[in-house]
């Protein structure tokens, strides 16, 4: 039995890898730059976490969202794996302290946003770390043709100059051929091994419902499926109004949109993650990296901006492999 499989069983309690997790892990362990295009819920995180545990040193994870970083760090810590994140609310003194601890080998995973790489002093400190792998979350953000372009992602390629022999692993769930090529070019990946998996999610059922009364229809759906749900709307006003209407009907709902203060976003997210709120009513600000296995229903009551957003948002459902809508 491989060491990678033993770690999967020990920390994640899964008996076997999904296709093509094991091949991706081996590619990284062989020192290759690697690009993984896997569907939402396809187990992308394990593809960098396991090789990072097998290699000496620390894994640097570049991630676009505070909520995503905190969720992954908490997930690793719950498995007794030492991880830390440089999030926006961390002071400069705390950053220095965290980086010192990374240098002394007290952490296996360091998460940070791409914007942190715009600070020269942080990059200088990173150069002193024994980095064994650089993992890029939501890699489509590096492409101007992607649906969530973040200019700061273009700074990641500079790490290649400092760590020419350290493997890069770029991961995303949404990238057409043009975006894939852009990712590999903009991240300066060297002869990357490319892995893709079918985007068919057998456990997801898609429905288009015609109705004159959306709220009544939502009430029916949520009553029939009382498990965790997400409702996507196009703007903040609809977000607040829909949540208020649901609460008046006796459902427990909370909201998430770009205009909320960070603390309120975190509080609402936690309420939903802990199933204190059945329904999260959200704009597309609530999207990348949200990994809650038991989401039963994702409802779009207004059209999303594009098909990529729809695929990502609908893909929040059924990550535990059970039937979802």
Language model region names:
Residues 1-4:
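Accessory DNA-binding and partner-docking regions appended to nucleic-acid-acting proteins
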Residues 6-11, 15, 19, 23-35, ...:
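Helicase motor core with emphasis on the C-terminal RecA-like subdomain
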